[in-house]
């Protein structure tokens, strides 16, 4: 039967938007997002009828794929500009280096096979070299094993290493993992964050990975200090021996990544990696994990650096958005029937440790032993805005709901003693926990014909919807007699869509104080339009012109006007003044409470903020 590639009829226009949210509650947290496409859903895929972006170019069954017999053997060092063409099949024998100042171009549809009979057959793009491997949706470039269908194994060949001249926190001439430290061509690092190593698009990497020793492994795709001038999107790493993707420093931005049934971690970030990753899928194989005596298999593993005190700079600060990470617990169907993995090295959906400042947003972590584990220093970073786990869904975290008999003897240690549960469930972070994971996605349980889109008929309905969260900025919380202070109320939309419909903000007037709206002389029960202005103290504009204000039963009420919508990752700021009444005695304590409702908010648990007031 002839294979026909049917291009998706629905295309998503990729835009670049820089958005900043500032939360001012008990602490200040800043979320800065660059190169991020706003979505109306959590996880890697939009709901149907939008096709999955994995259609056509991925392969869910590479073990049985037929590839051509090699016609060209490549070894040693490529020292001049070279093009590999789709009418040939290339065999990598041993470690093949692309020399500095040399460009390797690979045509769409080309197949490259790593020789499984030669130790560490691999492709290394040196600093200053370029790889231009741009496949297409219908003609992806494939790097795979030299073995015949049915006999391929993880680690049949080494994988791809790209070395750049961007920043890391170890130095400017650092040996890359997976190759001996004495090899001068296996070095990465520099001082050029915008360094360009070429492009890797619509590429599959299969059966790669190699371990020289513990913590010195070659991954399916290893990125050492790769700069933001490099283009990486639509890359599938399948059935690898170590990690699927590992970043050692660098600032490259990536989109549309697939980590499929790899042995160790799906996404590993180290040594100051600072790029942005959006739209990614990680799927575990319950029969294949790392050896827990050496390492454990995670969805994310993130470290700042490998040795205490973990304070090297620049710090690991990558940002991940819209990731679907599926652990090793498998459901027999959407109706249930969960079975535990046979391999014993699986642990966490996300392991954030060693002072990392990694951020994960708008993502799904499901069917793991543990959903999220953060070291104490990472929890501290998050409190200061240096790490984040926000607006995510954890489906069936077995730390808290261990309903599976632990026949393997794996100890469910109390790892989450560092404050992770409190951080995870803090309403301000907008996370949800779902106890019924099997029907979150349309069909996550087929390895050969999956559908990883949200299942709107099941638990996947929780993957979309708005999330309005208030924040308070107040000039002072300690008032002298008759003192007036400026008050700003920020209404953030941190959910997976714009607010929809009327938003209502309710503020009980604190006892002993008067709450007023600039430009409105007297608040009454009749809603009155506000006027936009700028806070003199905070030098911040406020959006009162989008709101009507009234006073009813001791409550100041603000309602958004018709047609006003707070955009995803945006905010609307309301400006007030608050005054201590002349008769209010010293030593008075009061509470300022802000509550927001409406706007199609699907997570009402985090819809209030408060601030203590006192007098002297």
Predicted features along the sequence, with ranges:
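Bacterial Sec-dependent N-terminal signal peptides
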Residues: 1-36
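Extracellular beta-rich repeat passengers
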Residues: 35-105, 115-128, 135, 140-242, ...
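Extracellular/luminal low-complexity Ser/Thr/Pro-rich, glycosylation-prone repeat/linker regions
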Residues: 38, 467-473, 480, 517, ...
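Solvent-exposed, conformationally flexible loop/turn segments
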Residues: 77, 478-484, 567-571
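Short beta-strand elements of extracellular/lumenal beta-sandwich folds
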Residues: 477-512
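Serine/threonine-enriched low-complexity regions used as flexible
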Residues: 489, 573, 577-602
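A surface/secretory-pathway sequence property marking extracellular, secreted
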Residues: 502-504, 508-556, 611-616
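Low-complexity, intrinsically disordered segments enriched in Ser/Thr together with acidic residues
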Residues: 550-586
């Amino acid at each position: 039967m002839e294979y026909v590639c049917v291009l998706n009829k629905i295309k998503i226009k990729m835009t670049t938007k820089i958005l900043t949210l500032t939360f001012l509650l008990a602490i200040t947290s800043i979320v800065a997002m660059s190169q991020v496409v706003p979505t109306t859903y959590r996880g890697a895929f939009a709901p149907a009828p939008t096709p999955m972006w994995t259609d056509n170019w991925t392969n869910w069954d590479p073990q049985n794929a037929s590839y051509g017999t090699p016609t060209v053997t490549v070894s040693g060092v490529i020292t001049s500009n070279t093009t590999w063409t789709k009418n040939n099949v290339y065999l990598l024998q041993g470690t093949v280096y692309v020399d500095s100042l040399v460009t390797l171009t690979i045509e769409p549809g080309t197949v490259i096979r790593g020789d499984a009979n030669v130790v560490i057959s691999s492709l290394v793009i040196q600093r200053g070299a370029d790889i231009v491997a741009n496949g297409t949706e219908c003609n992806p470039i494939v790097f795979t094993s030299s073995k015949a269908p049915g006999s391929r194994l993880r680690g049949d060949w080494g994988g791809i290493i790209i070395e750049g001249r961007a920043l890391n926190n170890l130095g400017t001439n650092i040996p890359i993992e997976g190759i001996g430290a004495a090899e001068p061509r296996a070095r990465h690092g520099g001082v050029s964050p915008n360094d360009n190593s070429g492009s890797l698009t619509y590429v599959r990497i299969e059966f790669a990975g190699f371990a020289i020793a513990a913590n010195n492994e070659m991954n399916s795709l290893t990125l050492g200090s790769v700069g933001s001038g490099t283009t990486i999107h639509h890359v599938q790493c399948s059935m690898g021996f170590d990690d699927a993707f590992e970043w050692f420093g660098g600032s490259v931005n990536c989109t549309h990544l697939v980590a499929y049934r790899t042995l160790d971690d799906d996404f590993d970030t180290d040594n100051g990696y600072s790029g942005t990753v959006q739209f990614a899928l990680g799927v575990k194989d319950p029969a294949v994990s790392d050896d827990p005596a050496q390492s454990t298999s995670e969805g994310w593993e993130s470290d700042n650096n490998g040795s205490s005190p973990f304070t090297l700079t620049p710090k690991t600060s990558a940002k991940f958005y819209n990731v679907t990470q599926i652990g090793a617990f498998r459901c027999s169907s959407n109706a249930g029937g969960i079975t535990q993995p046979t391999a014993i090295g699986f642990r966490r959906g996300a392991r954030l440790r060693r002072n990392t400042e990694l951020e994960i947003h708008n993502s799904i972590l499901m069917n793991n032993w543990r959903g999220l584990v953060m070291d104490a220093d990472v929890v501290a970073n998050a409190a200061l805005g240096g790490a984040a786990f926000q607006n995510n869904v954890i489906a069936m975290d077995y730390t808290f709901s261990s309903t599976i008999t632990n026949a393997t003897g794996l100890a469910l240690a109390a790892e989450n003693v560092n404050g992770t549960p409190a951080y995870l469930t803090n309403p301000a972070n907008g996370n949800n926990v779902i106890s019924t994971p099997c029907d979150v996605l349309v069909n996550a349980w087929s390895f050969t014909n999956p559908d990883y889109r949200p299942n709107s008929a099941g638990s996947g309905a929780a993957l979309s919807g708005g999330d309005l969260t208030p924040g308070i900025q107040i000039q002072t919380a300690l008032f002298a007699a008759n003192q007036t202070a400026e008050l700003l109320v920020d209404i953030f939309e941190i959910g997976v869509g714009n607010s929809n419909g009327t938003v209502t903000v309710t503020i009980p007037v604190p006892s002993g104080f008067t709450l007023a709206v600039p430009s409105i002389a007297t608040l009454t029960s009749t809603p009155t339009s506000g006027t936009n202005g700028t806070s003199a103290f905070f030098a911040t504009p406020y959006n009162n012109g989008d709101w009507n204000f009234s006073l009813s039963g001791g409550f100041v009420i603000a309602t958004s006007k018709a047609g006003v919508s707070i955009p995803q990752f945006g905010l609307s700021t309301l400006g007030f003044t608050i005054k201590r009444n002349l008769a209010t005695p010293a030593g008075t304590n009061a509470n300022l409470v802000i509550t927001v409702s409406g706007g199609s908010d699907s997570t009402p648990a985090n819809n209030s903020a408060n601030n203590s007031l006192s007098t002297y």
